[in-house]
From Swiss-Prot:
Record note on quaternary structure: The complex is composed of two ATP-binding proteins (SsuB), two transmembrane proteins (SsuC) and a solute-binding protein (SsuA).
Listed name of the protein: Aliphatic sulfonates import ATP-binding protein SsuB 3
Function: Part of the ABC transporter complex SsuABC involved in aliphatic sulfonates import. Responsible for energy coupling to the transport system.
Cellular compartments per GO CC: plasma membrane
Record's signal peptide: none
Subcellular location: Cell inner membrane
Catalytic activity: ATP + H2O + aliphatic sulfonate-[sulfonate-binding protein]Side 1 = ADP + phosphate + aliphatic sulfonateSide 2 + [sulfonate-binding protein]Side 1
Location, primary (coarse class): membrane
Keyword Translocase assigned: yes
Organism, as annotated: Pseudomonas syringae pv. syringae (strain B728a)
Binding positions (ATP): G49, R50, S51, G52, C53, G54, K55, S56
Gene behind the chain: ssuB3
């Protein structure tokens, strides 16, 4: 198995994504409506919006957990389905198996000599010394680091993050944001992060996309140097621009986003 540190240059580039005329309906309810989107290889994109707006549905379609009603999902010029081995998904819950040690959770599903790779992935997230402990010994933030290592061992070119930091305390959340940003800069994968936290979105993403009632309401480039200074005037101005757009929408309670059962071929961060 190729070491993470020995990947040839072409494996360090992310997947370019194209979404064309994408629609998703559940019965008579249309959740996504004619979404058109181009994401260059290696870009870090945050998707924000009110609950029920369709952002998690979009991520599920990109992850292959559901099928679009209409439209195309492309990796470059090829169907995105062709890139499933290069795609990993992280959820808000780490989904570690409690009866397997941490290193075995990282190598879950792999065959051959993978333990050195798993240790390397754990080192990348700062947990190599915890490799032979049980998941129960970890904090919530540490469990999410293991889930991230479980994604890294597969050398992803597309990393989909569905509110992975939502259950963490404020300080741990910032630390995880910084870790994800560091690893993204190191490995060059394309990232799509679904989050309710607008400040998180503008702090770590290249681009913030606001979904409004199933459509793209705002597509904002965050053209600021890294590392970004939290609390700076420029970051605050971008955050205010997104929040003002969100708060200008009618505030009626949304319906929850429907979902289909997880298919057996799901490739989350494992």
């Amino acid at each position: 198995m190729t070491s993470l540190k020995q990947q040839p240059p072409h494996l360090l580039r992310g997947i370019p994504l194209a979404v064309r005329k994408l629609k998703k309906a559940f019965g008579a309810r249309e959740v996504l409506k004619d979404i058109d989107l181009h994401i260059p290889a290696g870009q870090f994109v945050a998707i924000v919006g009110r609950s029920g707006c369709g952002k998690s549905t979009l991520l599920r379609l990109l992850a292959g957990l559901d099928k679009p009603t209409q439209g195309q999902l492309l990796a470059g010029s090829a169907p995105l389905d062709d890139a499933r081995e290069d795609t990993r998904l992280m959820f808000q819950e780490a989904r570690l198996l409690p009866w397997k040690k941490i290193i075995d959770n990282v190598g879950l599903g792999l065959s051959g000599d993978w333990r050195a790779q798993a240790l390397e992935a754990l080192e990348a997230v700062g947990l190599a010394e915890r490799a032979n402990e049980w998941p129960a010994a970890l904090s919530g933030g540490q469990k999410q680091r293991v889930a991230l290592a479980r994604a890294l061992i597969h050398k992803p070119r597309l990393l989909l993050l569905d509110e992975p930091l939502g259950a963490l305390d404020a300080l741990t959340r910032i630390e995880m944001q910084q870790l994800i940003e560091k690893l993204w800069g190191q490995y060059g994968f394309t990232v799509l992060l679904v989050t309710h936290d607008v400040s998180e979105a503008v702090a770590i993403a290249d681009r913030v996309i606001l979904i409004e009632e199933g459509q793209i309401g705002l597509d904002l480039l965050v053209d600021l140097p890294r590392p970004r200074v939290r609390g700076s005037h420029r970051l605050a101005a971008l955050e205010a621009e997104v929040l003002n757009r969100v708060l200008a929408l009618p505030g009626s309670p949304p319906d929850p986003e429907p979902f289909s059962p997880l298919p057996t071929q799901l490739r989350w961060a494992n």
